[in-house]
């Protein structure tokens, strides 16, 4: 598995501390909040913390989950992090058996089978994978506490994927390739062979014959590149020679820096607009994907240098803007960290 956090990684302490401080400022900030919530009756009209005793902050549930992923990752890759004691105290206070039971109880109510599908599902599994990587008493304790929720989303993936006739190729939360990439990472770390086999089978069925990608992007509120996340996703389940042959068909003109749109960082006209601010996320997620893709080509392949150059341009375009307005501040550092830690 070739995910960015599957290997030891280096990050400058100042950057790690900046990202940690950002996440700590919002993971327990309850408001403003955009709920993904079906009311089954009048008694379901409750504040976020009553609905989600663990993941109630960061504007929305999925951003809160990956805010915890960011903090858990920094705790592992930056051992001298100044914020480490605050992070441990946060996890001890929030990732508890009682809190997780409340999250599972929410899922078990009627009309909530599609809650956070597939984006929030995938990020919860990424958090679970990261906690497993710690190999510490803390990590084992948090992994055990989170396990019922982890198991619930593994079960949802296992039930849903065989029923899904088509992938979703949008550049937003619904993108299937992104969810499969993160689910694949969890399956690898947790040695969940049934999930790994299912993810690989769905990727082959949905993307294996794709060729001549036109890359009709960006969309106005994209934060993922449908083209690049598909390439990144396929690299997780195909052996390198097979993946390279697939890439020759999928994006045959990369050596000529085509499609041109994949090499041009997007502009962001209004960072106070939550949808337009997604475009900073697109630059950061493209940087992550380009770096991950580059690592799968041999050092003498000219596409490796081309991909790394594209990654640096995209990272430089949006890294300065992970803070400044809460529209982006509640989530962008996660994608910056993915990019920074990718080889």
Descriptions of predicted regions:
Residues 12-23, 82-98, 137-160, 192-210, ...:
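Extended, well-ordered alpha-helical scaffold segments
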Residues 187-331:
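Long, repeat-rich segments with strong aromatic
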Residues 37-50, 96-111, 146, 161, ...:
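Basic/polar, acidic-poor N-terminal "presequence/leader" segments
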Residues 8-13, 49-65, 105-122, 163-176, ...:
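Solvent-exposed loop and edge beta-strand segments that line ligand/cofactor-binding
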Residues 3-56:
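Low-complexity, Ser/Thr/Pro/Gly-enriched N-terminal "stalk/linker" regions
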Residues 65, 74-187:
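Extended ligand-binding groove/face enriched in aromatic
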Residues 26, 30-43, 60-91:
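Alpha-helical solenoid scaffolds in large eukaryotic transport, assembly, and signaling factors
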Residues 4-11, 68-81, 122-138, 179-191, ...:
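Well-ordered alpha-helical scaffold segments within catalytic/enzyme domains
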């Amino acid at each position: 598995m070739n995910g960015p956090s599957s290997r030891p990684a280096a990050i400058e302490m100042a950057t790690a501390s900046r990202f940690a401080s950002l996440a700590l400022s919002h993971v327990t900030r309850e408001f403003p909040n955009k709920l993904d919530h079906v009311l089954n009756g009048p008694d379901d009209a409750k504040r976020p913390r009553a609905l989600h005793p663990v993941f109630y902050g960061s504007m929305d549930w999925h951003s809160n989950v990956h805010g915890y992923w960011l903090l858990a990752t920094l705790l592992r890759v930056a051992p001298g992090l100044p914020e480490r004691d605050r992070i441990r105290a946060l996890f001890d206070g929030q990732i508890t058996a009682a809190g997780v039971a409340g999250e599972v109880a929410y899922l078990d109510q009627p009309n909530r089978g599609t809650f956070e599908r597939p984006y929030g599902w995938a990020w919860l599994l990424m958090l679970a994978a990261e906690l497993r990587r710690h190999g510490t008493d803390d990590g084992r304790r948090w992994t055990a506490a989170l396990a019922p929720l982890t198991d619930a989303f593994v079960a949802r993936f296992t039930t849903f994927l065989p029923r899904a006739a088509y992938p979703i190729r949008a550049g937003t939360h619904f993108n299937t390739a992104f969810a499969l990439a993160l689910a694949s990472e969890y399956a690898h770390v947790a040695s969940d062979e049934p999930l790994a086999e299912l993810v690989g089978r769905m990727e082959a069925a949905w993307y294996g014959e794709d060729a001549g990608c036109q890359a009709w992007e960006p969309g106005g509120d994209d934060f993922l590149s449908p083209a690049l996340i598909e390439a990144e996703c396929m690299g997780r389940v195909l052996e390198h020679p097979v993946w390279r042959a697939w890439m020759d068909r999928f994006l045959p003109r990369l050596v000529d820096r085509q499609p041109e749109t994949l090499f041009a960082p997007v502009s962001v006209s209004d960072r106070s607009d939550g949808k337009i601010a997604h475009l900073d996320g697109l630059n950061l997620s493209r940087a992550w994907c380009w770096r991950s893709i580059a690592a799968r080509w041999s050092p003498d392949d000219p596409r490796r240098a081309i991909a790394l150059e594209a990654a640096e341009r995209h990272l430089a375009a949006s890294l300065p803007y992970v803070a400044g307005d809460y529209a982006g501040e509640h989530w962008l550092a996660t994608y910056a960290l993915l990019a920074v830690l990718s080889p």
